[in-house]
């Protein structure tokens, strides 16, 4: 079958009149998106399933509990057949949308006449999807794993797994730096 996959990193401006919050409610949104076109609805649906597997892997690595839910019609992306929202569950119980998947069927392809030639030499409209995340994902990581004492990154993404800080004391009989170096070698 036919499958076309493209990616886009872009900035969108939003007229945000409410109080902004870093990484959560911003006027300038950074999107990281994948756009796909498929020969049929079934292949586009498989793409959505693969996208949701990626979500599972990313959220597991970031130690973020999420809810993946099909949005009601009023909350579906304009022009989409359906939208699946991915919401991180924050420590206070509130949710923060960090990603979404949209299945358009062939609605946009018909509107913009996006076609391919099938094996019978007939023009067919493609079935499209999009999948994306924004910097809210970083906000969710900070909100989940940070507090007034700082940020502890999840092991899968932490630049350092362990930091050994020798506590040097005057007139100590123990060479704490040597002990720290030995511990580091053991780890």
Where are these regions (language model features)?
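Short coil/turn segments at secondary-structure boundaries
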Residues: 7, 69-71, 152-157
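Single conserved hydrophobic/aromatic residue that forms the stacking wall/gate
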Residues: 1-11
């Amino acid at each position: 079958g036919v499958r076309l996959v493209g990616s886009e990193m872009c900035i969108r401006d939003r007229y945000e009149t409410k109080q902004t919050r870093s990484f959560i409610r911003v006027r300038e949104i950074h999107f990281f998106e994948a756009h796909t076109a498929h020969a049929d609805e079934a292949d586009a649906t498989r793409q959505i399933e693969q996208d949701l597997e990626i979500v599972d892997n990313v959220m597991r690595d970031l130690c973020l509990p999420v809810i993946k839910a099909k949005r009601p019609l009023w909350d579906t992306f304009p022009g989409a057949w359906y939208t699946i929202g991915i919401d991180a569950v924050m420590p206070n119980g509130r949710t923060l949308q960090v990603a979404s998947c949209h299945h358009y069927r062939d609605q946009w392809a018909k509107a913009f006449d996006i076609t391919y030639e099938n094996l019978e030499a007939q023009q067919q409209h493609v079935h499209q999807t999009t999948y994306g995340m924004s910097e809210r994902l970083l906000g969710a990581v900070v909100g989940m794993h940070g507090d007034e004492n700082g940020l502890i990154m999840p092991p899968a993404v932490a630049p350092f797994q362990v930091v050994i800080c020798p506590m040097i004391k005057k007139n100590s009989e123990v060479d704490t730096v040597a002990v720290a170096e030995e511990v580091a070698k053991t780890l």
